[in-house]
Amino acid sequence: IEVNKVCYMLSELVEQLPRNVRRGKIYFSIMHHPANSVRNEASVSIGYPFSSKSNPYARVGTDSFDFDSGVQMDADPSWAWLRNPAHHDRLIDMMKRGNQLVFKGTSARGTLTTDTYSLLGFSKALARLNQACPPV
């Protein structure tokens, strides 16, 4: 195992609401870090600092997945991670079967944003990710 090897895949959004809000980099990611036994870790870069009161979540189909913001975790305030690691595989399964992922969060300024990501090609990209960083 390459000790520091980390593999990830990114998806850029296809729609953001509201449209007139200036934001930094916005993307959803799935990461593997084999040396730490981390697989399918879901995170999002939202492009703004989250509000400390924000309850960010992702929705795929009718299933919702709660995230913790970097503000809540004393980490980068513009990132969020899936709250319950036991839900990573369920989220991945839903992303394989779904058409889109919708992520919602609230900025430190109080703006609620809704970002939509296409899941077209997700299964193929995940297969490449698994090939690059197989489980140990």
Predicted regions and their residues:
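A generic "folded-domain core" signal
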Residues: I1-V136
